[in-house]
């Protein structure tokens, strides 16, 4: 019994001593984790090496506490930074983590998946969130400008809320050349409702091999947008504020009163007596200064983000209020957007998530871009002798007469009547009257997003099911008010119109990704299917006045269709359309030792009968690509100290497009005609005949593209370089207007009858480095482009495009760029008469259409962009510029069929022919053939430009100061946006165009670009 007790006592003492020894070895380690700039890192994982279950994370100040046995190794890991291992031999640690540039840049988004950047074999460019943050852009498309080679941004207007057009590797069609936008896997026709602040990255799929997985929708390239998601770590609250003051970037020089009088007298447009009789002798109106003032923009963004190992969330709310430069309240854009993203790992084999973007907007805008009556054109056309308004009630005779005859003269806020020109009575009149003679309301909403689930039934296999949706609606109304602009432009009664549209789109996609690594071999396979359906409902109504107002009372409360007056003529119309598409797709990739890469993909798309006949509804779009990382070869080892990585790429593929097709364009339609007495008596029979001929052979437009590329990293990754050469051939363009049958007559349906070629080089070069506390980077890109129509149906010599004063200016013709400029070649001024002269190319003695020639193209020979950044301690500087060269602009602002309109000095007044200046380079005032002059090479200008889009200086307050008030980060900044432009173009802005491909480079007086002084701050809790 005593022996047993002694044994138990021994065991008890042994356990106590062992526990004491263990307690002595287990120690508390506390510390701080910072980055290279000594800023705390939040959410860094701290664990004991070999223990994958325990551990901790750093708090919002970068601090951590962990209990560990002395001598064990602690591992510190954080996304985007290199892991660090430290022995636990001290109770206090300060850990500095360094960015892992390879990790930060290693992944790019591709169709239905992601790829390591090192394994990409196609031409993919990436724009990161850093390129969009703190810019005054309100549209995500603008973030692409100058940031990646081969992408051109074309703007038809700079009005608040306007959306530019994106062109990837040229212009491939006589119809739409817009790329496909895919936001978090959901296809969108427009991304204007996505706030740039909510975007994590944008990938531009430029070559056919990268975009072929989207098949029939990818003929003009693809832009993949990934919105922000939550990150692992403690939650963050952010608030970003931005305020901008806008003013005209450039003021065109117009004739002042003295110059206008002189020019009118020289041209015998008006006699001196008439001019002096109808001018008060003092008025010298600058309509540009009168109508444009200071615009303002403010933007607020509130964000919440966070997550853990199982899930994350990102919530964002943005409000934008942009009051444009046109004085008054008819030039504004207000938008409220929200982003709600979340995902959660429910089981080790199941992850679910959702992405959602919501937009609500209201807009008012002024008329622009139309030579036949727009406010913007009126600013450049109105004479300087007419006042903005008549002060003191002193009305000239012609105005008093109009008032006495019951005309509705509008007044300003002070009750003074707006000025009415006694010299010009065309489509343009006082810009303030054009601004105020109607009340327009435009509003709408967009809701788009997805719900998805990722299943992992076995190792290396992920099956994704994703339902995407897009709902949008627009509401607009226009009240045309009584006004008097001049003797030819007036309205006596109120008219009312309104429209409403709703669009519903959904897609359901199921696809599987399988990745298997077998020794040195890695295989990735993806297969899937997709179904898409969209519906569109549209309804419109109108009230036309008949001897009295079309509404019961001329009051804003009655500007609705349901307040129609008894005499109003009512009209209503509308339509509903539906289309659907079914698809199968697959991709196979092979990688050997990160050295050799092969990839092949195929997509099969089937359009429904609303687009194509049953015989041609299926389209097949294959692609292959390969890559060779030469730097992984043994023979390359001597060069690796300089060239870190060098890869060659090659790809070929096909994509399609149906953008130029309307519903049932291939069908033969019948229409009722006249009535005929084909039987005796008074019985008449209504005739029916084909209104269109139909085309059961109609098929997809197809783009075929070959790409050769080089990617290189040099000097330990500090320098990166890429180059691509591409040849893109688009065939079977959809063309209308071919010659119909002379027997049957009627109009023809579209046929596949055109081919276009685009080819060029793309270069991207970057350098980044740091010298102590000073870091800097330089990035530049340049792209060349040669565009040509290579085939057009023999029945068509050329297709007409945009006109000016009813004269066609642009054409689609074999052997020339898409919609090039065509007109008379101006050869100079006849020194005897002062009239313009033109080249008589066929020596007929008369100027005919056969004498017109190629006057250039709006497509640049090359585009480029450059970005400079620098940072020193808390200060940071960013400078960004972009430009284009070789493009032409057709100036169509000044109407020569109305010689009494005002003139741009550089175009008509300076160095004009006079008796004392017989060698002048501009026609005399009142010259003959001015209609031909206005549509000749004389009005075609070099559109090359370089713009410094942004100069921004920021300062981040020290964290040691901010932590005392529970603030994690506070950055203040000021910026000058679009302040400096180098160009020879005399108009408002060299970045001009009409709103479609047929009017590229045509300047008809669009809303001009503003320059902005910007102030803002970024706050993070």
Identify what each model region corresponds to.
Residues 43, 106, 126, 150, ...:
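Extracellular/lumenal ectodomain signal focusing on beta-strand-rich modules
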Residues 132, 178, 184, 298, ...:
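Extracellular/periplasmic, surface-exposed regions of secreted and cell-surface proteins
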Residues 238-280, 367-376, 539-547, 664-665, ...:
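Conserved small-residue
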Residues 1-339, 344-353, 448-449, 774, ...:
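Short, small/polar-rich motifs associated with maturation and membrane association
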Residues 270-283, 299, 372-433, 437-439:
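Acidic, glycine-rich flexible loop segments
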Residues 843, 877-946:
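C-terminal beta-barrel architecture of Gram-negative outer-membrane proteins
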Residues 38, 62, 185, 392-393, ...:
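Detector for glycine-centered tight turns/loop "hinges" at secondary-structure junctions
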């Amino acid at each position: 019994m005593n022996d047993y007790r002694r044994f138990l006592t021994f065991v008890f003492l042994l356990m106590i001593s062992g526990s004491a020894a263990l307690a002595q070895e287990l120690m508390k380690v506390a510390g701080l984790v910072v980055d290279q700039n000594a800023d705390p890192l939040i959410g860094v994982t701290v664990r004991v090496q070999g223990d994958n279950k325990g551990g901790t994370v750093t708090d919002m100040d970068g601090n951590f506490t962990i209990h560990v046995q002395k001598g064990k190794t602690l591992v510190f890991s954080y996304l985007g930074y290199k892991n660090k291992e430290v022995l636990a031999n001290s109770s206090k640690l300060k850990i500095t983590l360094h960015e892992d540039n390879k990790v930060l840049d290693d992944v790019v988004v591709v169709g239905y998946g992601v790829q390591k950047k090192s394994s990409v074999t196609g031409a993919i460019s990436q724009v990161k969130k850093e390129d969009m943050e703190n810019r005054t852009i309100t549209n995500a498309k603008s973030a692409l400008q100058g940031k990646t080679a081969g992408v051109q941004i074309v703007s038809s207007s700079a009005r608040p809320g306007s959306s530019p057009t994106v062109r990837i590797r040229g212009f491939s069609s006589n119809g739409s050349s817009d790329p496909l936008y895919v936001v978090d896997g959901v296809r969108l026709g427009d991304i204007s409702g996505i706030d740039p602040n909510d975007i994590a990255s944008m990938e531009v799929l430029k070559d056919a091999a990268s975009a072929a997985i989207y098949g029939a929708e990818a003929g003009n390239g693809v832009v993949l947008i990934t919105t922000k998601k939550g990150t692992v770590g403690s939650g963050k609250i952010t608030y970003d504020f931005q305020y901008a003051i806008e003013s005209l970037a450039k003021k065109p020089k117009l004739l002042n009163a003295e110059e206008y009088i002189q020019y009118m007298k020289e041209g015998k447009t008006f006699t001196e007596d008439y001019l002096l009789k109808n001018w008060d002798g003092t008025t010298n109106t600058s309509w540009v200064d009168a109508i444009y003032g200071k615009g303002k923009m403010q933007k607020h963004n509130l964000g919440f983000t966070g997550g853990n190992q199982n899930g994350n969330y990102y919530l964002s709310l943005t409000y934008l209020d942009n009051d444009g430069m046109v004085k008054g309240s008819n030039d504004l854009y207000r938008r409220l957007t929200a982003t709600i993203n979340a995902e959660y790992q429910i089981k080790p084999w199941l992850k679910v998530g959702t992405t959602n973007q919501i937009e609500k907007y209201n807009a008012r805008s002024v008329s622009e871009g139309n030579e036949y009556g727009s406010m913007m054109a009126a600013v450049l056309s109105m004479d300087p002798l007419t006042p903005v308004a008549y002060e003191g009630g002193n009305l000239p005779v012609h105005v008093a007469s109009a008032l006495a005859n019951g005309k509705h003269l509008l007044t300003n806020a002070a009750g003074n009547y707006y000025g009415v020109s006694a010299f010009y009575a065309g489509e343009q009149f006082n810009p303030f009257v054009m601004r105020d003679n109607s009340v327009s309301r435009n509003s709408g909403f967009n809701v788009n997003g997805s719900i998805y689930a990722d299943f992992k039934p076995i190792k290396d296999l992920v099956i994704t099911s994703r339902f995407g949706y897009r709902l949008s609606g627009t509401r607009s109304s226009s009240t045309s008010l009584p006004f008097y602009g001049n003797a030819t432009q007036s309205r006596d009664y109120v008219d009312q119109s309104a429209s409403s549209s709703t669009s519903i789109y959904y897609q359901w996609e199921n696809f599987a990704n399988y990745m298997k690594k077998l020794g040195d071999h890695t295989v990735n396979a993806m297969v899937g299917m997709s179904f898409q359906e969209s519906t569109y409902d549209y309804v419109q109504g109108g009230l036309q006045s008949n001897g009295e107002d079309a509404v019961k009372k001329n009051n804003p409360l009655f500007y609705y269709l349901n307040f129609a007056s008894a005499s109003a003529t009512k009209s209503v119309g509308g339509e509903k359309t539906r289309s659907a598409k079914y698809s199968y797709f697959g991709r196979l990739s092979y990688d050997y030792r990160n050295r050799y890469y092969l990839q092949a993909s195929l997509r099969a798309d089937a359009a429904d009968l609303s687009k194509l006949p049953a015989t041609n509804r299926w389209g097949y779009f294959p692609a292959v690509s390969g890559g060779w990382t030469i730097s992984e070869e043994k023979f390359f080892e001597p060069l690796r100290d300089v060239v870190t990585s060098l890869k060659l790429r090659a790809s070929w593929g096909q994509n399609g497009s149906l953008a130029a097709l309307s519903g049932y364009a291939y069908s033969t339609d019948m229409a009722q005609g006249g009535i005929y007495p084909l039987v005796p008596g008074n019985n008449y029979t209504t005739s029916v005949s084909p209104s269109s001929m139909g085309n059961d052979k109609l098929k997809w437009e197809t783009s075929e593209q070959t790409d050769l590329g080089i990617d290189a990293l040099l000097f330990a990754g500090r320098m990166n370089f890429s180059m691509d050469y591409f040849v893109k051939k688009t065939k079977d363009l959809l063309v209308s207007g071919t010659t119909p049958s002379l027997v049957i007559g009627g109009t023809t349906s579209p046929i596949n009858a055109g081919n276009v070629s685009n080819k060029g080089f793309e270069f991207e070069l970057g350098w980044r480095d740091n010298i102590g506390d000073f870091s800097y980077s330089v990035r530049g890109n340049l792209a060349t482009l040669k565009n040509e129509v290579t085939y057009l149906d023999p029945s068509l010599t050329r297709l007409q495009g945009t006109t000016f004063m009813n004269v066609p200016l642009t054409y689609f013709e074999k052997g020339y760029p898409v919609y090039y400029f065509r007109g008379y070649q101006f050869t100079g001024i006849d020194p005897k008469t002062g009239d313009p002269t033109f080249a008589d190319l066929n020596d007929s003695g008369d100027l005919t259409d056969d004498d017109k020639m190629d006057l250039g193209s709006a497509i640049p020979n090359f585009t480029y962009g450059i970005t400079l950044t620098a940072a020193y301690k808390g200060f940071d500087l960013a400078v960004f510029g972009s430009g284009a060269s070789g493009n032409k602009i057709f100036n169509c602002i000044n109407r020569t069929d109305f010689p009494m309109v005002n003139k741009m000095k550089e175009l008509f007044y300076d160095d004009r022919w006079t008796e004392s200046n017989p060698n002048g380079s501009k026609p005399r005032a009142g010259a003959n053939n001015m209609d031909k002059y206005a549509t000749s090479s004389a009005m075609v200008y070099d559109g090359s430009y370089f713009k410094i889009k942004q100069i921004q200086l920021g300062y981040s307050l020290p964290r040691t100061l901010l932590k005392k008030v529970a603030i994690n980060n506070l950055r203040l900044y000021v910026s000058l946006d679009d302040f400096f432009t180098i160009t020879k173009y005399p108009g408002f802005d060299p970045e001009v165009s009409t709103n479609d491909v047929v009017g590229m480079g045509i300047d008809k007086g669009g809303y001009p670009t503003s320059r902005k002084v910007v102030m803002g701050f970024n706050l993070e809790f």
